[in-house]
């Protein structure tokens, strides 16, 4: 349905929806009482999943006799997969395999409410939670009565993460130099067209931000080997004191910042001074506080670098833009909401009297007009190729950590994915790359001796010919005593690579068939994809050619054992259980090893490389600010998004409903002793509720009153529980913002919840992302958006 034709149809559809909601009880059904509580989870985070498993285990250990046990029902596909699965079970009235609880977003409550399957948490104490984070329950359509239907157990918000070294390079080149109004001489990091005229404002906020930008560049410049820049310093010693003064900026133009600028310049290229762009522009900290100024500044920067505005067909190794946006629906929703004064009456739709009202957008009211303004601001940046948007799993942090973006807007839950390690490693595919995934094993080529250098051990010749490669995984089936014994057994055990050694075991990859003596899932995986097979074989042949001379030399010197060992260590691919996305080119899905809870991928056609630290963004080099909270700088209200899954109840039957609420109350209110899993706290324990344990484990925040009431919230809760080296600055910023929400200092935004809100969100995001690629104008964007919505809205 297209809005410009469909006023009558649209109103009719909403009326029909209201009727369906009112008649929801007709679709209500009871589930079979099977004596257990099922919790549906589609979590993709390993830390969150492990925490949930620990919680279920703990509850089943401490529950009273006669209380129902709880178990996890795993759903694939993330939150969208969970939404689809629930809708299907509601539609078919699944009485036997449905669940009692689900971790997902509150629009599912509306889906349940349409058929009377929502479960209010009437017997759950929620008084420990800040009421501001429960009021979204007042904005859920189709429910039968007011109440608490969703409980936020893992909140996050969005931050603007600035790549300090990159922004320093941009501003340092654009800045007016002290005493150089007509000075042509430039530093070695500047090009012939880069004599800057930009000025930095002197207000307190801007001065503080500029110092942070300087400090991040210094830290980045220090990260490589010391002394590299000192030679260049000596060469410049012939400059007179006057010349040195002229080439210095008001900031500390130290060797460290110069090292950083020089490194960034390698990928960003020369700064170009352009009339009406950054020429005579005044840089202020307030630029990052509102959408209009942020997008205007970003567009100006994009126009100043040829590698951005002249490149409309970016490859993975290219600079991706100035601004990265991980969730375009979030950015569009919050900017339009802010432009409407933080009032849901001025938003795309609102929930009123239990019904969703989309008339504001349909009638081209304030939300439509504000969307047009916001889109216009984005359009300038889009046209100059200055924005990167996440189109399905490729997050801004994947590029920002390699200096390919100046700043990005992303979730506070992504802190541990946002920065490079001290030794930044990635897999390069030639024209693109990915950061070296966690939980990754190297795939070794089979040796001429047999399976990875071992004797045949009864395997057939065909089995050897079918062998593509091997990798090792931890052998969880081996008793700890055996592992300890093997660790002390010396070099002989460690060299026995083809058999179970230490706490590892070898997994064999075969084509065509798995030979006798090997078992699929236990110690073998059958590779079926022809592309994977060919690339593994090709990599093995390539390695053989490269090492022929060396292997021959080793044989001549009668060092055959060393040659065999070297041959067996050839890397021809990688395999991981981390959440990397299949691309059908270099990354493919393969079968899991028995006991694994996460999908396994195989990565082929990649070369591992380790970069200098100055080529990457470390957490201490990022400047973390709130995502823009206003549309215009002068707007009276500041807006912050709150997001994250809720625990949602589903009607089953009288007994299971009571047992479900009993578990949720325990989850929120019963302190238990939990063993910590983080490296720095391994073996230690802490007493806290299951909800607190879950939020901490998953890098989320539980909106407890006591947290927001403390004056030292930032320092107490900002410390990262996973490593002593890094402080979770994203969590610090989230707590700071949530505290302001709790104290009514800023306005919280979350999507009004309707059974159609998920489709509305998905459609506006997909259509905007397509407009970024096609550079569509606003009219075309709206036309495509409404067409995508179809008759559902």
From Swiss-Prot:
Residues 1-22 form the signal peptide. Keywords: Cell membrane, Lipoprotein, Membrane, Palmitate, Signal. This is Uncharacterized lipoprotein MPN_506. A lipid is attached at residue 23 (N-palmitoyl cysteine). It is found in: Cell membrane. Residues 212-227, 247-264, 472-485 have a biased composition (Basic and acidic residues). Its main location: membrane. Belongs to the MG185/MG260 family. InterPro entries: Lipoprotein_10_C, Mycoplasma_lipoprotein_cen_dom, P68-like. A lipid is attached at residue 23 (S-diacylglycerol cysteine). It is a lipid-anchor. Residues 491-504 have a biased composition (Low complexity). It comes from the Bacteria. It comes from Mycoplasma pneumoniae (strain ATCC 29342 / M129 / Subtype 1). Residues 237-246, 449-468 have a biased composition (Polar residues). Gene3D superfamilies: Periplasmic binding protein-like II. One of its GO terms (cellular component) is plasma membrane.
């Amino acid at each position: 349905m297209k809005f410009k034709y469909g006023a009558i149809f649209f109103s009719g559809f909403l009326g029909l929806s209201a009727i369906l909601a009112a008649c929801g009880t007709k679709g209500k059904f009871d589930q079979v009482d099977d004596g257990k509580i099922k919790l549906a989870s589609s979590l993709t985070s390993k830390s969150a999943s492990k925490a949930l498993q620990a919680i279920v285990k703990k509850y089943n250990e401490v529950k009273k006799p006669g209380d129902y046990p709880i178990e996890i029902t795993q759903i694939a596909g993330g939150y969208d997969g969970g939404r689809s699965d629930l809708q299907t079970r509601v539609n078919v009235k699944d009485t036997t395999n449905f669940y009692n609880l689900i971790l997902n977003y509150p629009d599912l409550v509306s889906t349940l409410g349409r058929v009377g399957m929502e479960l209010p948490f009437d017997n759950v104490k929620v008084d420990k939670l800040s009421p501001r984070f429960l009021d979204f329950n007042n904005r859920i359509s189709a429910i039968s009565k007011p109440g608490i239907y969703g409980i936020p157990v893992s909140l996050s918000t969005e931050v603007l993460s600035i790549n300090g070294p990159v922004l320093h390079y941009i501003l340092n080149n654009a800045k007016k130099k002290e005493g150089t109004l007509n000075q042509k001489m430039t530093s070695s990091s500047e090009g012939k067209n880069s004599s800057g005229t930009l000025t930095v404002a002197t207000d307190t906020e801007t001065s503080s931000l500029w110092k942070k930008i300087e400090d991040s560049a210094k830290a980045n410049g220090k990260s490589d080997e010391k002394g590299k820049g000192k030679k260049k310093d000596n060469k410049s010693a012939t400059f007179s004191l006057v010349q040195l003064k002229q080439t210095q900026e008001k900031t500390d133009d130290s060797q460290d910042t110069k090292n950083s600028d020089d490194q960034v310049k390698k990928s960003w290229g020369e700064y170009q001074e352009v009339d009406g762009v950054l020429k005579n522009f005044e840089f202020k900290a307030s630029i990052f506080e509102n959408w209009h100024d942020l997008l205007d500044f970003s567009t100006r920067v994009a126009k100043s670098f040829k590698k951005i505005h002249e490149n409309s067909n970016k490859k993975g190794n290219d600079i991706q833009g100035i601004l990265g946006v991980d969730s375009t629906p979030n950015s569009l929703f919050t900017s339009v909401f802010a432009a409407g004064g933080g009032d849901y009456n001025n938003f795309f739709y609102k929930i009123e009297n239990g019904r969703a009202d989309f008339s504001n957008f349909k009638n081209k009211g304030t939300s439509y007009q504000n969307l047009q303004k916001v889109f216009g601001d984005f359009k300038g940046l889009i046209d100059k190729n200055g924005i990167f948007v996440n189109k399905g799993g490729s997050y801004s942090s994947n590029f920002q950590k390699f200096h390919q973006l100046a700043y990005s807007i992303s979730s506070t839950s992504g802190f541990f994915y946002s920065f490079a390690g001290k030794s930044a490693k990635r897999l390069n595919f030639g024209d693109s790359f990915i950061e070296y995934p966690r939980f990754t094993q190297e795939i070794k080529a089979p040796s001429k001796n047999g399976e990875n250098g071992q004797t045949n051990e009864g395997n057939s010749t065909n089995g050897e010919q079918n062998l593509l490669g091997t990798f090792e995984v931890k052998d969880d089936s081996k008793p700890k005593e055996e592992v300890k014994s093997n660790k002390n057994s010396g070099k002989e055990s460690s060299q026995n690579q083809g058999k179970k050694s230490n706490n590892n075991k070898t997994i064999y990859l075969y084509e065509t068939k798995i030979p006798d003596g090997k078992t699929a899932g236990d110690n073998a995986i059958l590779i079926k994809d022809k592309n994977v097979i060919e690339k593994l074989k090709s990599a093995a042949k390539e390695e053989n050619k490269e090492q022929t001379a060396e292997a021959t030399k080793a044989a001549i010197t009668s060092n055959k054992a060393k040659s065999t060992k070297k041959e067996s260590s050839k890397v021809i691919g990688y395999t991981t259980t981390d959440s990397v996305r299949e691309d059908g080119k270099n990354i493919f899905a393969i079968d899991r090893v028995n006991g694994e809870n996460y999908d396994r991928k195989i990565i082929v056609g990649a070369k591992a490389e380790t970069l200098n630290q100055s080529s990457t963004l470390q957490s201490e080099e990022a400047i973390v600010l709130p995502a823009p909270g206003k549309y215009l700088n002068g707007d009276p209200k500041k807006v912050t998004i709150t997001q994250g899954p809720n625990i949602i109840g589903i009607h089953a039957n009288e007994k299971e409903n009571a047992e479900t609420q009993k578990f949720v109350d325990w989850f929120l209110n019963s302190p238990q002793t939990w063993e910590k899993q983080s490296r720095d706290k391994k073996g230690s324990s802490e007493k806290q509720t299951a909800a607190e344990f879950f939020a901490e484990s998953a890098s989320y925040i539980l909106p407890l009153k006591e947290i927001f009431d403390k004056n030292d919230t930032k320092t107490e809760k900002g410390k990262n529980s996973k490593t002593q080296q890094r402080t979770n600055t994203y969590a610090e910023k989230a707590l700071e913002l949530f505290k302001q929400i709790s104290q009514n200092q800023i306005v919280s935004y979350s999507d009004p919840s309707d059974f159609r809100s998920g489709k509305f969100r998905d459609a506006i995001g997909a259509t905007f992302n397509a407009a970024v690629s096609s550079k569509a104008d606003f009219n075309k964007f709206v036309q495509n958006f409404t067409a995508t919505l179809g008759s559902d809205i």
